[in-house]
């Protein structure tokens, strides 16, 4: 059975986007610098069909390729789905499960890469794990992560720590609503533009 993981880029002060993030301002005010590491390297990595490759460091490329090789399904929230404009129908993790209260009917069709889940995060994780089989399910939205941690369903957390202070916006770990969650550091990879951190969630 694969693992349930979380992976996002975060600023040094804990934000994954600046204030006022929306479909016309995807990373929010001041958030663009989070992803400089996507373009400052010399190794190409393709993350989804129909999009140009990223150019990252060799170390980052190796980690990303390893991550994609074990990816069985992805989970996002509806806000992320809308901000990304549905990734043009090519999400960077397919099949893609979208947790939402309102299903966008234009994407309910044969061949759609999206499964819309209206009965909560735990249901989305259960469905994604069933599809992923022996591969991993990756969560890519902070609010989904927070709910999944509360439910004790997250096995590992991967943070790409960007060298920037945003000062406000979308916090990765807001609203946990529980006591301390102990983590075990399992990997640290330092590059000139980003530090990749990996933690195992210690479950009690």
Model-identified regions with their sequence ranges:
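Enzymes that bind and transform nitrogen-containing heteroaromatic metabolites
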Residues: 1-204
């Amino acid at each position: 059975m694969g693992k349930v993981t979380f992976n996002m880029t975060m600023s040094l002060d804990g934000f994954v986007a600046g204030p006022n993030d929306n479909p016309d301002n995807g990373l929010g005010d001041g958030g663009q610098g989070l992803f400089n590491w996507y373009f400052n390297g010399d190794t190409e990595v393709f993350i989804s069909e129909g999009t140009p490759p990223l150019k990252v460091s060799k170390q980052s490329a190796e980690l990303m390729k390893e991550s994609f090789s074990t990816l069985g399904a992805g989970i996002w929230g509806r806000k992320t789905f809308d901000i990304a404009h549905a990734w043009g129908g090519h999400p960077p993790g397919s099949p893609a499960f979208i947790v939402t209260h309102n299903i966008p009917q234009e994407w309910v069709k044969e061949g759609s890469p999206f499964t819309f889940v209206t009965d909560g995060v735990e249901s989305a994780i259960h469905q994604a794990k069933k599809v992923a089989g022996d591969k991993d399910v990756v969560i890519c939205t902070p609010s989904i992560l927070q709910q999944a941690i509360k439910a004790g369903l997250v096995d590992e957390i991967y943070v790409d720590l960007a060298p920037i202070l945003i000062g406000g916006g979308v916090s990765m770990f807001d609203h946990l609503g529980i006591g301390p969650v102990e983590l075990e550091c399992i990997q640290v990879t330092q590059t000139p533009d980003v530090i990749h951190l990996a933690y195992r969630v210690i479950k009690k």
